[in-house]
């Protein structure tokens, strides 16, 4: 499935290359600290020292967030529950609510987090390699995109951690949607912190 997801993502990026309109990414790096600040005093209720850990991550991402990469229309939410398969072949992608104009490599960063960890914490290089190979057969990454995959993946994991953290404290008890534990993203971020280049992701 990962190879199919990579190829579909590349096709989506190529198809949108001539789309003339733009939409701001309202959940990019500049939005993360304002999202977190009202939750600072409550974060430690989930884990001791959690607020300070998040603050340190945000400081790193704010200093190191890439600029100048190829941009276009991105989905930004390519999780398995938004992708459909029939007989092993990708048949559809839904939920373009967060689609926007931003770095194309962001979608790959999302997919690395959403598709390439087993048991919620163990990174699967084979899956990542298939994902990136499927993508690059149609749209090869340039050197800057490859080099920034670790920080992009780290940042997108933090984005989802923060939205989960917000929902954890603001979802009504009788809501139909189920809260997702923000702590589940911590091992993913720790993995990306340990990566210094794109080689561990299986980039060829």
Locate the predicted segments by residue.
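Structured catalytic core of nucleotide-sugar glycosyltransferases
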Residues: 1, 33-38, 49, 63, ...
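A cross-family kinase active-site recognition segment
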Residues: 1-49, 69-71, 176-182
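Generic structural concept
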Residues: 3-6, 40, 55, 75, ...
